[in-house]
Structure formats: structure tokens, C-alpha cells
Amino acid sequence: MKRGKTAVIVGAQWGDEGKGKIVDVLSHNFSIVARYAGGHNAGHTVIIKGKKFVLQLVPCGVLRKGCRSVIGNGVVLDPLAFLKEVKMLRDAGVQVDGNLFVSNRAHVILPYHRMIEMGAENAPGRVKIGTTSRGIGPAYEDKMGRRGLRVADLLDSKLLKSTIENACREKNMIAHALFNSEPLDADSMYAEYAEAAKQIAPFVADTAVLLNQALAEGGSVMFEGAQATMLDIDHGTYPFVTSSSCTAGGAATGTGVPPNAIQNVIGITKAYCTRVGGGPFPSEVEGAVADQLRARGNEYGAVTGRPRRCGWIDLPLLRYAQMINGVNWWVVTKLDVLDVLDEVPVCVGYKIKGKKYDSVPALATGFEQVEPVYEKMPGWKKSTEGVASFDDLPKKAQEYLRFIERESGAKIGMVSTGPDRDQTMLLPEFEAEIIHPVEKHPLEKAAPKGAKAK
């Protein structure tokens, strides 16, 4: 039987490219949106008719009627953050019950993960990565060290209690010795998370079964990435990266669908570039130009509120992202931010000690030595905000986009010209290939047989 259509949404830069908006725009064409990596360190912002939603764990598809949402096994779940987000959605009138499923194999973030991360980030002499201090990294460390607690384990009260008691003994000792941290109380932690487990239980399912059965029945799935290519644990600017596989390859391992089920990879890039926290950023600019980009683009973290570092679009980086992810379509966001510029520099290559490179260095130290090579393109000095057709864009804006397309290895399928859901243009070829009516919703009534956690 032919599987339903699939697409992965992946960030091509250092995150904050606008993935949440794009998932929201496209989600009405898919039966399911599945999140496959990261935790509540990723803030995806969606604006619908002026109303702002910031989703950190729940996939953005939850905001579309008829679209089901899945939190996959590759995600690390903070139960309290999840329940807070569910409450926010319910209060806003969003239907989550029966529409939202959490993998029973997803790992759980507990207070000692936050304690360890905060201590490590603030320890003297340690390289500051710029984490959100929400316990993401330590939770993944426990997962890889086979010490983690999964959502299925969270629902087993005896296992939950013994895991918390054993972990608190170990983590308290480590945190006190290394960071002089105050100890955490295992009994109060167990009481709080045992109660949270009761509230989470109705959402828990074997989501790998759920997703594969939906695809087999002709349902369509969009895989929602978190963070971005250059923050990927393997392919990013290590060690200034996140702790999960946030490239397109993570969609299969992070949800339990087979790799050959992935049909399209849609890479999201801003019309310029930003980064939060430490780490190399070859095309970064400072001063008045950075302030202008930051102000026009509202470049502040959706989760932390931290100001983002700003710079010009980096084509070697985009080519790298295209190669690693197999991107076959680009979505360019925040084009309107550049409307006021007389000229728009584009990083077309790198120099290291006078030698030209057009690829991305493996070492962060190599990245820090990079001197960007720029080609300056003329600005268009006209508003693109809300423009709905490519042909209606200013000529110079069209040329800018075609240059990016020509030099980056994939076609542009969508352009975002404002923050609202409706301020988005779809190019005809992309629309013909990706946009399609959803004829059936395999999850309309309940999780399929065999999906519900025991």
C-alpha cells in the first residue's frame, strides 16, 4: 500500500528561522504534525490574526483544526512545562484532548537535570555554551548513559520513586562537589511528578505505531524540527550546539518512522541570519546595522528573551545545510526586514589565513578564524510586507531571492513577508508538489489499535 505524503521542516541556520509559522501555514495540508527532537528550549512562535502563541513542546499543528499532534520519542519532556502549555492552549480554546499524543518512549526532564546544567553553565573556567538552563543536555546525557526515565516509566509509580531516589543521591553528591549546589529533596520531587504523571497519562501512546499506521492508511505527516542544522549535535558548530539530532535525519530516529518514508525536506532560512548564545558566526555584524536588523526583525528569543546576534545570509552555510539534510525546497522568512536597506551583503565564501573556502569548517576554532567574503546586492527600498505573489515583489527583491536559490542548491518554495499566518506567499511549483487536500484523518476518533501505552 502506498504511504501518505511526508515532509520534514528543518532549520538551516542557528534556529529562530520561523519554523513555527511555516509549520502552522502548511499544517492544514497534513493529518499529523510530529515533533522529533529537542525539548522546551525551543520556542516556536505562531501569530494568527494578531494573536500570538509561543509553543515550546507541543507541535504547532495543534492550532489547526483536524490536524493531530505528536511529541515523538526523540524529544525530552519536562512534565510540568508540558502541562503548563496544555493549560495555556485549553484556556485559549484550542482542542488538545484527543488531538495530542506523547510518545511513551520520550525521556523525561527532572529537577536534577536543571540543577546540573545551571551549575555547569555557571562554573568558573567552563566554556559558556549559552544554554537555556532547562535541563535539556543533562536529560540527553542520562538517556545516552542508559540512566534516563522515560514517559512509560513515569507512569509506573514504583519505578518513578526508585529512579528519583537513586538519581537524587547521585546528582546531589555531584552537584554539591562540583558546584556547591543545595540538595534536592527526593520525596517532594516524587510527590510532584507522580501527580503530574496522572495528568499526562491520557496523552501517552506508542506514537511509532500511531504514525506508521496513519501513513499506511494514507495519512500525511509533517515532521517539525527544533533548533537547526548548525546546532545539531553531530553536524553543528560543536561544542556550541544542542544535545539532539535536529537535522532531517533525526525525523526518522526521533519518531520511529522508517527513513524511506521521508519524501520532502523543507529548509527554513531567514533572508539574513541570527544566532543566540555563544559560538562562531562568520557573517555577524555589530553596531547600528545589527541594531536595525534586531529592531525590525524583533530578534529576541521566544523562550529566553535574549537579544539575538544578527548578520547577513551565509551561502556556504546554506549549501552545507542543503547537503546534510537533503533539502529540496527552501522557505525564506523575514524578507520584509531588509526592505529599508540600500544594499544587502551576501556571504558567498570564506577566507582562512588568506586561503579561500566554500565549505564549513569542522572545528569551532576554524570557524572563528573565518573571514567572510561578501557580494553586495542592491536593496529594493520598497515594502514587501504582506505581498502575496512573487511577481508583485520589487524587482531587486526577486533578484535577491533568485540569487540565493541559484547559489544554495535548492528551489525557493515559500517566502514569508510578515509575522502573521496570512503574510506568506507560496510559489506555484511548490504549491503543486507539497500542498494537497487531506482526504482522511486516521486519528479522528482515537489512537489506533496497539498505540495506547500499557
Mark where each language-model region is.
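Non-transmembrane, aqueous-exposed alpha-helical and coiled segments at domain scale
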Residues: 1-454
